[in-house]
Amino acid sequence: MKKIVVIPGDGIGKEVMEAAMLILEKLDLPFEYSYYDAGDEALEKYGKALPDETLEACRKSDAVLFGAAGETAADVIVRLRRELGTFANVRPAKAIEGIECLYPGLDIVVVRENTECLYMGFEFGFGDVTEAIRVITREASERIARYAFELAKREGRKKVTALHKANVMKKTCGLFRDVCREVAKDYPEIQYNDYYIDAACMYLVMDPFRFDVIVTTNMFGDIVSDLAAGLVGGLGLAPSANVGERTAIFEPVHGAAFDIAGKGIANPTAMILTACMMLRHFGYVEEAKKVEEAVEKTIKEGKKTPDLGGNLKTMEFANEVASLLD
């Protein structure tokens, strides 16, 4: 029995989580769900955006399924990533038939190192001068590179591309690039190459089909994964996972969207696909495929939420997907 902590959070997080839970409960898998608070409402209610009770439950869980948070998002999700040691942020960018996008048929994955780089928060100010310390270690670089190659191997993908800026940041990016090249030697069946981050952004816009799995450092990965999402329809359709040695956090990329919260029109696609990533994580690959195919079939038939030009409400869309799982 897998213990899943469910955190709906703020805004549309509650609505899209309800949709995803409808799908998960329909599958009737050996999961034990427990609901906890985190986010803006939790801050107002408990004085903490991430209450101690929630954090403790997350530490004991096999996975966390997270909806969305508002202004306190960084206090919740960034801290959770750190506390749970989720070193890999996995962000697929896959075009869905029936949704207009720049590159139909595109299917790539961005694997982002989640624990170091400039996002460690080592920033200092001296009058009119500020500075930040960038930390890149061999251990974290090897761990994320190996994760990217193992993901490629597991999913039958053929290529891993590392992104860096070693021509300028010779020590930090140089170490990351060199470690990726070393790890690549252990996977001769998988193609490897690397690009400077600026050139890679150009290639992503002009010819994204040259990529398959992208692995990169924390800040570059944050930026490039949003770019990749834009190629296939935007952040509203993008799922993600934060994976550690012992547990994982699964969250849609979109935020709380307070402007549409409570109207019942939020698109739950990203949240449902995020739940599918959790299913795959636990080895329920066929179940995940079944849900993904149901989502794609629903959208292809023109049954969409308003943001995609349709007229279905959040739970109406979820029910359409669920009906295909019978």
Swiss-Prot record:
Its EC number is 1.1.1.85. Binds 1 Mg(2+) or Mn(2+) ion per subunit. InterPro entries: IsoCit/isopropylmalate_DH_CS, IsoPropMal-DH-like_dom, LEU3_arc. PROSITE patterns: IDH_IMDH (PS00470). It is an enzyme of class 1 (oxidoreductase). GO terms for molecular function: 3-isopropylmalate dehydrogenase activity; isocitrate dehydrogenase (NAD+) activity; magnesium ion binding; NAD binding. NAD(+) binds at G255, A256, A257, F258, D259, I260, A261, G262, K263, G264, I265, A266, N267. Pathway: Amino-acid biosynthesis; L-leucine biosynthesis; L-leucine from 3-methyl-2-oxobutanoate: step 3/4. It is found in: Cytoplasm. Keywords: Amino-acid biosynthesis, Branched-chain amino acid biosynthesis, Cytoplasm, Leucine biosynthesis, Magnesium, Manganese, Metal-binding, NAD, Oxidoreductase. Mg(2+) binds at D198, D222, D226. GO terms for biological process: isocitrate metabolic process; L-leucine biosynthetic process; tricarboxylic acid cycle. The record marks Y119, K165 as: Important for catalysis. Its cofactor is Mg(2+); Mn(2+). One of its GO terms (cellular component) is cytoplasm. It catalyses: (2R,3S)-3-isopropylmalate + NAD(+) = 4-methyl-2-oxopentanoate + CO2 + NADH. It comes from the Archaea. Its main location: cytoplasm. Belongs to the isocitrate and isopropylmalate dehydrogenases family. PANTHER family: DECARBOXYLATING DEHYDROGENASES-ISOCITRATE, ISOPROPYLMALATE, TARTRATE (PTHR11835), ISOCITRATE DEHYDROGENASE [NAD] SUBUNIT ALPHA, MITOCHONDRIAL (PTHR11835:SF34). Catalyzes the oxidation of 3-carboxy-2-hydroxy-4-methylpentanoate (3-isopropylmalate) to 3-carboxy-4-methyl-2-oxopentanoate. The product decarboxylates to 4-methyl-2 oxopentanoate. Homotetramer. This is 3-isopropylmalate dehydrogenase. The gene is leuB.
